Amino acid sequence: MTDDGYRARYRTAQQIRSGGALGNIFDGPRITAHGLSTLVLAWPGTGFQTEAVHTTIVAAGQTSEEYTYDLAEEAFLCRHGQVEVLLRGDWVTLRPGDLAYFPAGVPHAIRNTSDGDAYLVNQICPPQFDLYIDAGLYNPTWGDMDEEAIRKAKLNAEPLDVGPLDELDEMVFRDDQPKVRAQNLTPEEVAHGGALFNVLEGAGFTGIGLPMRLVLWPAAGTRLVGFNYAYCGTGVEDTMHTHPVSDEFLVMWSGQGQLFIGDIGWVDAGPGDVALAPCGVMHGHRSTADRGPSMMGGFASPPQMDLVIPTDYYKNGVYERPQPSELTDSQEHASDQG
């Protein structure tokens, strides 16, 4: 059992900034952003500076406002349900495991024409402070976060009831809609108009001891948003690490395991649990005999250059794009240790 004092709702921004916290993708203060109900998870109110991560709830039949960020990039990961996003001039379907990337200056919108609610986890880099004004969490007159309002909002936040988390839709490999898939576009095309990604498709990487894919990163065409996806097999522990300049929001998307978080240490974790690890905060994960395996994935901004410097993907400030590939079941389970 995790001490409640380690959870993000009970820690100040300063405590999280220096030592991290345990969160969950369905637990955070609720605001309205672009007409949609939104849970704020990692943001300046939790000590994050380079990125904000929210969960956006899109009810059946609902459509967002159309909006543009001239400064920030945004990526949406579909965790459950199905939506359509306005991407590269057309409505594109987003299903569990798919990510939609929007560069700065690109208009976008979301609609749900299905019969059920959808849950999207979105990363905004850098954070858009104006999204927090109407909820009283950011004071535009003085240009600062309202710490007392944030404290009360976090303490009184009602976790979103989505039923058993292990019964949410599975995030799987998809390569439909090829015209907008990142692997079929050049990095320059992705950087200009955005693209559709998938969590199981990207550049192969094993630098922290796990089979994983670099999904959103500069070699694929993104600049500020970053996302990696990994399998943590039974009996496996990754290399404990920090990121010098990247805040990370590390999610256990499915399965069971343990997370290591800053000054908290090892804590049990399950589907939807998150290690909030701002830059410099030690973090990692492992699967034990009675807790594992799991699928892990982290949003980080800027993309973690420290991971790729030792590889052939980076040299003297320039990224080399390898051929994207699928992270397969056989590759995942080949790493199991017990």
Question: Can you annotate each of these PLM segments?
Answer:
Residues 35-42, 54-70, 209-214, 228-243, ...:
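Conserved short histidine dyad/triad with adjacent acidic residue
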Residues 46-49, 59-62, 82, 222-223, ...:
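Short, charged/polar surface micro-motifs in flexible loops or helix N-caps
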Residues 1-50, 135-224, 239, 311-338:
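A short, N-terminal "cap"/entry segment at the start of jelly-roll beta-barrel domains
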Residues 49, 84, 96-98, 104-131, ...:
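Ligand-binding loop in jelly-roll beta-barrel domains
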Residues 62-96, 106, 237, 243-271, ...:
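A short beta-strand-loop-beta hairpin characteristic of the jelly-roll/cupin
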Residues 55, 68, 80, 87-89, ...:
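Residue-level recognition of conserved beta-strand positions in structured domain cores
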Residues 38-40, 53-57, 75, 91, ...:
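Conserved hydrophobic/aromatic beta-strand scaffold that supports enzyme active sites
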Residues 4, 268, 274-279, 285, ...:
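Non-catalytic C-terminal interaction regions
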